[in-house]
From Swiss-Prot:
Homodimer and heterodimers. This is CASP-like protein 1B1. The modification N-acetylalanine is found at A2. Its main location: membrane. It comes from Arabidopsis thaliana. Keywords: Acetylation, Cell membrane, Membrane, Transmembrane, Transmembrane helix.
Amino acid sequence: MAVSKLTLAATSGKSCKILLGLRLLAFSATLSAAIVMGLNKETKTFIVGKVGNTPIQATFTAKFDHTPAFVFFVVANAMVSFHNLLMIALQIFGGKMEFTGFRLLSVAILDMLNVTLISAAANAAAFMAEVGKNGNKHARWDKICDRFATYCDHGAGALIAAFAGVILMLIISAASISRLVQPNKCCSTTASPSVVP
């Protein structure tokens, strides 16, 4: 009996560290996706016509906030980053709090909501990136990635980070749900196992 309590406490501590590491990775991925896309901007000057021998130039700017899907992407990634930051702080500094009952359920529900949010944002941005890269002949939308290559490369990097965040949040959500079945005092510094002979 005492040995099983010690084993459970050791396993609980190890799973807490893994969950904390996953949250740190998810926080990094979603925050970097939000920052890269939020700072994504490229300005270029093109010749749009000629009057005689004089070229007429126009300056165009590609920014993330020109597309509502990219704005949603930045906001959603920032929200998921904030959620993970709160959960990390709670896990590190909330040593006296027991994660049982309603608290575990609320964390699991929030994790699932954040998986849904970041997945929707990443897929919406991926759709717009596809249109930007290849255009749409039926709607007569021209592609822009052949003209704004840096803008598209930064957007692709943000999408990769966001999809990494989606995968990490799926794993975190599964771990949160599994903790509902076997609740423990995750990362509790005050609880120490007692050995009873």
